[in-house]
Amino acid sequence: MPNFKSKKIKEINLPYSKDDVEFLWLAKNDNVSLIYTKVQEESFFLQIKKAQNGFVIKGDKHTKPSKIGYLQKALKIFKEGFCEDIINEAFGLKNNALIEKTPFIVDNFDELLSKLQGKIYIEIGFGSGRHLLYQAKENPNVLILGVEIYNPALTQVAKLAKVQNVNNILLIQSDARLLLSVLKSKSVEKIFLHFPVPWDKKPHRRVIGKDFCKECARVLTQNGRFELRTDSFEYFNFTLEQFLTFPAPKFSLRKNENLEISSKYEDRWKKQEKNIYDLWVWNFNQECKNYELNEFNLSSVEFSKEDLKKIEQNFKNITIKKDDFFLHFESIYKQDENLLLKVAFGAFNKPEHCYLHLDKTIDFVFKEPFKIQENIKAINELKEILKVQFKI
């Protein structure tokens, strides 16, 4: 994560803007200050954290922009405008950093869903993009949707697509399980999962699980196919066992088959003479229906100034666990007379992190979390906890 350390920070008078970077407002607690930052169409927090002999300034990891160049530019402007005696820095705004909005990267699920049409392939964890770009070139009439949790991979592959004149891809930063949960039933032709982290010693951390397999079966078309390629026999066998729970699936199993394109990980494993396993699954024949999405309905909550004072005074770092969701109150910040809450919540295998702004009402600071049932339940619980736990 790009960052720098400064001995001194000048008085921060906001709003402040320069070179398409805007610092609009600040919220803080005893250890951390958050600056609401806008660069072109994206918003995120810069974080100022007290450290020994100075301050560390970096992007907040749960709101970081999809384009790393935006964060680098914001850090540069903040350093020049508000900092003295720079101790060290670990960022540099390069001329070729991806700053301009690219049509290949979508920022949220609403934007993604508006662009999905025709035949769709999904690649989960596309990494360097070799296989994703190969599929895009071989299937020009198919939309190749890549999902990846690491921002640098999105930026790198978007650049490669532009250079190689590949136009039928979309990339999104997300947990694959969350992505699948928002897609329409019977809407995807293929799902590729190539060389996932095997987690052989911690299988509970694998993306593969019963719920994931059910979601694959739901979103795949009648003749749609799931394709796993892995160097881990344990992962291969585990995945096979998960799909064997379906009534009449069909499988194709292969070992050490050479494909037309090879990822850098596959090249590495072949040099080490490791075995490579392929598992294809289709014929799920599962009756599925699209989820009906509810609303968060935050408009039903109102606060007085006295309520906000009580929330601030009584705030505790607490976690509530229910059967199918959790809610964790992580931090609280003061923004003038208003409050900022940082919370984690949702399904145990698909956690969300977000900030909520409290004044007379309560609102999500950035985009809304997607309206899956676990998130709806968690936010409803949050509204009750604010009343009961924090005594308003």
Swiss-Prot record:
Binding residues for substrate: K201, D231
Pfam family of the protein (one): Methyltransf_4
Keywords: Methyltransferase, S-adenosyl-L-methionine, Transferase, tRNA processing
GO molecular function: tRNA (guanine(46)-N7)-methyltransferase activity
Enzyme class: transferase
Binding-site residues for S-adenosyl-L-methionine, renumbered to this chain: E123, E148, D175
EC number of the protein: 2.1.1.33
Classification via InterPro entries: SAM-dependent_MTases_sf, tRNA_(Gua-N-7)_MeTrfase_Trmb, tRNA_methyltr_TrmB_bact
Catalytic reactions of this protein: guanosine(46) in tRNA + S-adenosyl-L-methionine = N(7)-methylguanosine(46) in tRNA + S-adenosyl-L-homocysteine
Keyword S-adenosyl-L-methionine: yes
Gene Ontology CC, one term: tRNA methyltransferase complex
Pathway: tRNA modification; N(7)-methylguanine-tRNA biosynthesis
Family: Belongs to the class I-like SAM-binding methyltransferase superfamily. TrmB family.
HAMAP family: tRNA_methyltr_TrmB
Function per UniProt: Catalyzes the formation of N(7)-methylguanine at position 46 (m7G46) in tRNA.
Name recorded for this polypeptide: tRNA (guanine-N(7)-)-methyltransferase
Naturally occurring in which organism (per UniProt): Campylobacter jejuni subsp. jejuni serotype O:23/36 (strain 81-176)
